[in-house]
Amino acid sequence: MKLSIDFKNKVREAILSDRENYGGSDADYAKRLNLKGAILSRLKKGEVEKLISDTQWLVIAHQLGVQVRDNAWKVARTVVYTEIEDNLLYCKEYSKSMILVDDCGIGKTFCSRHIVRKLKNAFYVDCSQAKTKQQFIRLLAKTIGVDNTGKYVDVKASIKMCLIYLEQPLIVLDEAGDLDYNAFLELKELWNATQGECAWYMMGADGLRAKIESGIAHKKVGYAEIFDRFFDITSIVPQGTDDRREFYIQLLGDVASVNAKQKEDVDKLVRKCMNPNDLNTKDVTPSDWKRLRYLENLIKLS
């Protein structure tokens, strides 16, 4: 697959935009993208040809949310988007820490990625891609622009220094339930070292909820301290069945209204998500409800 000049220029524009939201040096920013400083300098001057491999272009595009093909999926300001945005802005402003534990498929990842890209010194980490403490620390280092190839203790020390040096940094830890026990303990150390200087926002679904409950119930060393530091555990989806149903109808409707090809299809799409098997209404249970990924597939196939 040969990448077009237009695509490379889109990635270049994304790099320049992302650079504006990073408070470190050009050299540090280049490390985030696994680029040499000289290559970044040439990109800033407008060059795109014969600088890096097509694979590197694609890796950077993925990191910065640039699509190879425009899928035309629009962002809806749902209650999930607004709640996460409010949480992130609060944490960032006051260097606080929070945990969001909620249903899967409500747009937590999509919303947080979109919001983080707009904020200065805000960083998104997908913990499902770095489950052990070694993988996690080195991925975090790369994400914030720190050399992640040295000795483990040196990399960790550099992370602490960088997070203290940056202005109001925010770290979003998505899929945090995938982190193993030792990686969780590293979070306690990082939080202690950056208290009052860095905001942390942990997100997850059933896996994170189970890890929190099991760790505290079995009195695993460090767990109570970790979740005490992430002082507020929040959820967005209501608990009562009727309230949950109304929440999902609203969420699906909000997303469908800005993405459906025909506006008159919105109600039909929502009904299909809430009752995908065409059951009698009284036989439909919350476990039958489909969520945003299903809605996206319906819209793209329509």
Model regions: which residues?
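Short, well-ordered alpha-helices that flank and scaffold nucleotide-derived cofactor binding pockets
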Residues: 117, 142, 189
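Short C-terminal boundary/hinge segments that cap the last helix of small helical domains
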Residues: 65-79
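Mid-core helix/loop region of P-loop NTP-binding domains shared across ATPases and GTPases
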Residues: 132-138, 147-199, 221-222, 226-227, ...
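Conserved catalytic segments around the Walker B and adjacent sensor/switch elements
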Residues: 119-129
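Sensor-1/coupling segment of RecA-like P-loop NTPase cores
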Residues: 97-104, 191-221
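Walker A/P-loop nucleotide-binding motif
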Residues: 93-114, 128-129
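Pre-Walker A adenine-sensing motif
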Residues: 75-93
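C-terminal alpha-helical "lid" subdomain
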Residues: 1-66, 232-302
